């Protein structure tokens, strides 16, 4: 009897711990949303975080976007050529990047680069008792430390997604026009005529904002709740990448389904 009872007790403790974590995360999320107007008033702090997070990720975003554009140009051309529609390569590359690959791949790279940096920074501040010292001085660490970083990630992510998509389109053009020989006029005219600014670009912007909010919040939450030890900070950075990546992929499916149903 003891083994089943022990197993049931462990299951109950795990469920209770999971629900407590969800509650604490929801409480932190609500506080960050409520504190956003006050955070925007600290423009310099937010601008510093946008620069820090964007600068952290710009190189890998640009290089990745270029190679994704190369691959899209090659794969798209040889696929469209089967149906005699190779002149639509520009439209295929643009829609693939703006609606889907731009926001998603940027969010995954953002989680691995900037997200882990945020988690490590907050975790080290916690292990060094800097957050506790702020509380001792009646300074709210959520408002002072977390909110500017939350806003910085929310702003930086759409900008990085735009850079990724723009560089990817240039990569697709380079392969399609310069390497394969697709007509440049057809490449750009198909893109110009087929991409809807409000529907296609707007949907991509919405995705990038949602992904930026998600990745930044996960990174801040993991750093703020980690164990104040080197091992705890290391585990928190790993959890940031795993949780944020899964959340981005799941939200991408939900948002895509909603956008196509409208």
What are these regions (language model features)?
Residues 52, 56, 60, 64, ...:
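Loop-to-helix entry region at the N-terminal start of transmembrane alpha-helices
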Residues 1-46, 222-227:
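Short, membrane-interfacial amphipathic segments enriched in basic
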Residues 60-75, 254:
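Hydrophobic alpha-helical transmembrane segments of multi-pass membrane transport/permease proteins
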Residues 38-63, 242-245:
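Membrane-interface helix starts
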Residues 233, 239-256:
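Final/C-terminal transmembrane alpha-helix of multipass membrane proteins
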Residues 75-98, 166-209, 213, 217-237, ...:
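Membrane-interfacial helix-loop-helix connectors in multipass membrane proteins
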Residues 122-147, 230-233:
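Short cytoplasmic-facing helical segments at TM-TM junctions of multi-pass membrane proteins
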Residues 140-161, 236, 240:
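Start (N-cap) of specific transmembrane helices in multi-pass transporter permeases
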């Amino acid at each position: 009897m003891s083994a089943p009872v022990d197993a049931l007790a462990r299951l109950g403790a795990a469920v209770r711990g999971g629900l407590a974590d969800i509650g604490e995360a929801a409480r932190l999320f609500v506080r960050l949303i409520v504190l956003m107007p006050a955070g925007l008033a600290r423009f310099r702090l937010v601008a510093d975080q946008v620069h820090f997070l964007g600068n952290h990720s710009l190189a890998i975003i640009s290089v990745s976007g270029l190679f994704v554009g190369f691959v899209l140009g090659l794969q798209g051309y040889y696929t469209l050529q089967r149906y005699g529609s190779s002149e639509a390569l520009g439209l295929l590359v643009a829609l693939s990047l703006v609606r889907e690959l731009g926001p998603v791949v940027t969010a995954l790279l953002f989680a691995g680069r900037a997200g882990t940096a945020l988690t490590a920074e907050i975790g080290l501040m916690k292990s060094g008792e800097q957050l506790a010292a702020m509380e001792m001085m009646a300074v709210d660490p959520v408002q002072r430390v977390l909110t500017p970083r939350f806003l910085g990630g929310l702003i930086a992510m759409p900008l990085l997604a735009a850079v990724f998509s723009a560089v990817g389109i240039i990569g697709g053009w380079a392969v399609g026009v310069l390497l394969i020989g697709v007509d440049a006029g057809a490449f750009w005219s198909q893109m110009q005529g087929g991409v809807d600014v409000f529907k296609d670009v707007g949907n991509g912007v919405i995705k990038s904002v949602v992904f930026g909010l998600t990745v930044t919040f996960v990174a801040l939450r993991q750093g703020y709740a980690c164990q104040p030890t080197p091992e705890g900070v290391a585990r928190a950075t790993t959890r940031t990448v795993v949780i944020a990546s899964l959340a981005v992929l799941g939200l991408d499916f939900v948002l895509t389904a909603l956008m196509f149903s409208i």
